[in-house]
Amino acid sequence: MSKRTTYCGLVTEELLNQKVTLKGWVHNRRDLGGLIFVDLRDREGIVQIVFNPDFSEEALSVAETVRSEYVVEVEGTVTKRDPDTVNSKIKTGQVEVQVSNISIINKSETPPFSINEENQNVDENIRLKYRYLDLRRPELAQTFKMRHQTTRAIREYLDNNGFFDIETPVLTKSTPEGARDYLVPSRVHEGEFYALPQSPQLFKQLLMISGFDKYYQIVKCFRDEDLRADRQPEFTQVDIEMSFVDQEDVIQMGEEMLRKVVKDVKGIDVSGPFPRMTYEEAMRRYGSDKPDTRFEMELKDVSQLGREMDFKVFKDTVENNGEVKAIVAKGAADNYTRKDMDALTEFVNIYGAKGLAWVKVVDDGLSGPIARFFEDSNVATLKDLTQAESGDLVMFVADKPNVVAQSLGALRIKIAKELGLIDENKLNFLWVTDWPLLEYDEDAKRYVAAHHPFTSPKQEDISKLDSEPQNAQANAYDIVLNGYELGGGSIRIADGELQEKMFEVLGFTKEQAREQFGFLLDAFKYGAPPHGGIALGLDRLVMLLTNRTNLRDTIAFPKTASATCLLTDAPGEVSDKQLEELSLRIRH
């Protein structure tokens, strides 16, 4: 077997008239009777190779036996293609390789789906079962090349700015906050369990107390939660922590790193500083704490109509401390039928809204089911509050503020997608700041941390923990990209007494706090520096940089929506002996 001289996807005009040795997979084969053309593929791309009896009758006879996905080695000379056969869609499209010798390294059975097509109609379960074949597709190969470029850019930036790459434990202690833990039973300590980390949060804080000053890690994290298109049970996090910093320092670092990533991976210069928006403003204007700012259609408060109109739904809502908000789909009045509006009503029902009121703005006023409730003065108020014009579709939700925000925020995205308002080539970064420190859990009847229990309140709000904890703001910041939460960070609590107070507000007894987090409270006794950081979802970042819509396309061997691996059939049963060693028994 000869040594490969270059990759298939790197054979360009620079190699004209040179001999090359290539190895790869048969992507496509065309027999034109006397001449055989093969597209040979490897991770760098595809090159056309030609079997011509004038060059080698022996090679031609072997080529007659090869089929799709055979692994072959070829030797040949790079020549220029005829002008009428140039393929401008690929970087090797100006040349071809005249083959003088071919060896079949390994044969292939007929794959369960075609590798040389987009496979949009192939059942995803089939793709995941044969993931090693799915990953051969040039489209996915390019995605993982960009993933590598992304991690390389991140490491380069952090390495060049004084960060240490330090690993933290994978087997750790289960803590009650956040999502469910994946538990690992201990054989040595009967009846006791490790947990796989949801985040290296506490360890990175301990590393700051240890004096390492700047830490990072590209790390696997695990959460046993219900899945959706942008969630996986195991995911990769870019974890960063810094000592002696404030919020501005972390934000500046995050922006510099992300600008380098986008420049290195996509060749795009992202201007800075990134826009910022408070949590309150994001919820008020977009109905989301991760707003997609690539298009307008902001939520407009029209509660004034509830005080002026004789429309019971609006009126009762406002009188009961609710609110009425609207979104305006510009020029979309003719795009939606009554049946379409019924479907949109069902959509907002998912988010708790009792209904969706709507009107279409026409030249002489309004049309639609509730148009009759609008006096001329009400129409004027509506237009003044929303800037609605003739041809626009106006949709209203009247309910409790959180229901209004969630339902209209989701509807805003749905309408924008249906009307094609989103520029998929845009990268709109946004910082969301000034988060509430706490959220009230109606089921548990207690406060829970909006981010996590180690987030510091703003200095001026520390006193509120005793009297009005619901009004305390966090020293927290999220980075949003195109409507997705890319990452979140905060300045951490670095004082033992304040951390104990935070646990108390969250409903922990002193004994519970000591039992679960005693090691952290002890560490605070030995001189903790002020510190803060951020964690970015690498899988999600790659998904957005590659214009993917499914997180699974950015993970080499992902799980399904039900957290199974169709390739390996994980999770699976284990033997009685294994269970016995762990002192476990399965109860059906």
UniProtKB/Swiss-Prot annotation:
Task: Summarize subunit and interaction data from the UniProt record for this chain.
Answer: Homodimer.
The record's Pfam families line, in alphabetical order, gives: GAD (PF02938), tRNA-synt_2 (PF00152), tRNA_anti-codon (PF01336)
**Source organism's superkingdom?**
Bacteria
Query: What is the E.C. number?
Result: 6.1.1.12
Supply the alphabetized keyword list.
Answer: Aminoacyl-tRNA synthetase, ATP-binding, Cytoplasm, Ligase, Nucleotide-binding, Protein biosynthesis
Q: Per the similarity annotation, which family is this?
A: Belongs to the class-II aminoacyl-tRNA synthetase family. Type 1 subfamily.
Catalytic activity, per the record? tRNA(Asp) + L-aspartate + ATP = L-aspartyl-tRNA(Asp) + AMP + diphosphate
Protein name per its UniProtKB record: Aspartate--tRNA ligase
For this protein, the record's HAMAP family field holds:
Asp_tRNA_synth_type1
Please tell me where ATP binds in this chain. Answer: R223, D224, E225, Q232, E485, G537, L538, D539, R540
Q: What residue spans carry the region label Aspartate?
A: 201-204
Summarize where L-aspartate binds, as residue positions.
Answer: E177, R223, H451, R492
Q: What does this protein do?
A: Catalyzes the attachment of L-aspartate to tRNA(Asp) in a two-step reaction: L-aspartate is first activated by ATP to form Asp-AMP and then transferred to the acceptor end of tRNA(Asp).
A GO cellular component annotation in the UniProt record:
cytoplasm
Checking PANTHER family in the record gives: ASPARTATE--TRNA LIGASE, MITOCHONDRIAL (PTHR22594:SF5), ASPARTYL/LYSYL-TRNA SYNTHETASE (PTHR22594)
Read off the InterPro entries from this record.
Aa-tRNA-synt_II, aa-tRNA-synth_II, aa-tRNA-synth_II/BPL/LPL, Asp-tRNA-ligase_1, Asp-tRNA-ligase_1_N, Asp/Asn-tRNA-synth_IIb, AspRS_core, GAD-like_sf
Q: What are the subcellular locations of this protein?
A: Cytoplasm
| UniProt gene name | aspS
Q: Name the Gene Ontology biological process terms.
A: aspartyl-tRNA aminoacylation
Q: What organism, scientifically named, is this protein from?
A: Staphylococcus haemolyticus (strain JCSC1435)
Q: Which EC class is this protein assigned?
A: ligase
- One Gene Ontology term of the molecular function aspect: catalytic activity, acting on a protein
